[in-house]
Regions:
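C-terminal folded domains that constitute the principal catalytic or ligand-binding module
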Residues: 124, 148, 160-161, 166-173
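N-terminal catalytic or cofactor-binding beta/alpha core of small enzyme domains
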Residues: 1-136, 149-158, 180-191, 196-210
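Hydrophobic, aromatic-enriched interface-forming segments
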Residues: 142-150
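Small/polar glycine-rich anion-binding or flexible loop at a beta-alpha turn
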Residues: 137-141, 166-168
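Short, solvent-exposed polar/charged micro-motifs at secondary-structure junctions
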Residues: 47-49, 142-143, 173
Length: 210
C-alpha cells in the first residue's frame, strides 16, 4: 500500500506549521505502507494543483492531507468538505476569496472516504487527544480537502482520501493568549502515524457512536 501524506507551509504570520513539521517526522513505512510526504503551499490557487500533480505521479492508495487548526485542543479528522472558499485572512499569495465556489461543477459537499472513527479510536487508545470534526472551515484546508475529494470522485474512485486538522505546536503557543491549546510536535506526529495505521487496518470505517 502507498499513502500520500501532505502538510501545509506556514501561514498567517507563523514561522512554522505543525502540519508539515509533523508529517516530516513520520517514518517512511508505517504498518507496511509506503509513506510519501508532500509539502503544499497555503494558497487557494496552487495547493490543489500541487496535490493533484503528486497524486497523478504516485497513484497512492490513500491520501491524507494535514493542516493546522489553531485553537483546537485535539487532533481532528474531518468528515466533510464544502464547496465554498470564504477566507477571513489572505492566503500566502494575498488571495482572500469571499463566498466563491471551489469547483463550479462540483457537488455542494464531499464526505471523507477515510476511516475517521477508527482513526479517532486508535489515537484515543494511545492517550492522544482526538475527536471527529464536522467542519474543515472555509480557508485553504477545506479547499484542499474538497479538491482532493473532487479529484477522487472524478478520476480515482478506488482511492481513499480526507483531511486531518492538528493543534498549534507547543513552540507556537508562547506568543498566543494564555490558555491557547497546543500539542507537542512528536505527539502530533505519533497521532498521525496511528491515523495511517487505521487506514491500513480498516478498509471501511467503524460503525460506532462518536
Amino acid at each position: 500500500m502507498k499513502i500520500l501524506v501532505s502538510g501545509f507551509d506556514p501561514f498567517g504570520g507563523e514561522t512554522v506549521n505543525p502540519a508539515y513539521e509533523a508529517v516530516k517526522l513520520l517514518p517512511d513505512t508505517i504498518a507496511g505502507a509506503q509513506i510519501i510526504k508532500l509539502q503544499v503551499p497555503t494558497r487557494f490557487a496552487l495547493s490543489g494543483t500541487v496535490l493533484e500533480a503528486a497524486v497523478n505521479e504516485h497513484r497512492p492508495d490513500a491520501v491524507i492531507c494535514v493542516g493546522q487548526a489553531g485553537g483546537r485542543s485535539a487532533i481532528t479528522p474531518e468528515r466533510v468538505a464544502i464547496n465554498l472558499a470564504d477566507a477571513s485572512i489572505p492566503d500566502n499569495a494575498g488571495d482572500q476569496p469571499v463566498d466563491e465556489p471551489i469547483r463550479k461543477d462540483g457537488a455542494p459537499a464531499y464526505f471523507t472516504s477515510l476511516p475517521v472513527k477508527a482513526m479517532v479510536q486508535k489515537m484515543r487508545a494511545a492517550g492522544i487527544p482526538a475527536a471527529l470534526s464536522y467542519t474543515a472551515g472555509s480557508f485553504v484546508c477545506n479547499s484542499l480537502m474538497y479538491t482532493l475529494l473532487y479529484l477522487i470522485d472524478r478520476q480515482y474512485p478506488a482511492m481513499r482520501g480526507g483531511f486531518i486538522h492538528v493543534p498549534y505546536a507547543m513552540e507556537q503557543a508562547g506568543n498566543k493568549p494564555l490558555g491557547t491549546p497546543s500539542m507537542e510536535l512528536h505527539q502530533i506526529a505519533r497521532g498521525l502515524a496511528l491515523a495511517v495505521e487505521a487506514v491500513v487496518e480498516n478498509e471501511r470505517d467503524l460503525t460506532v457512536n462518536r
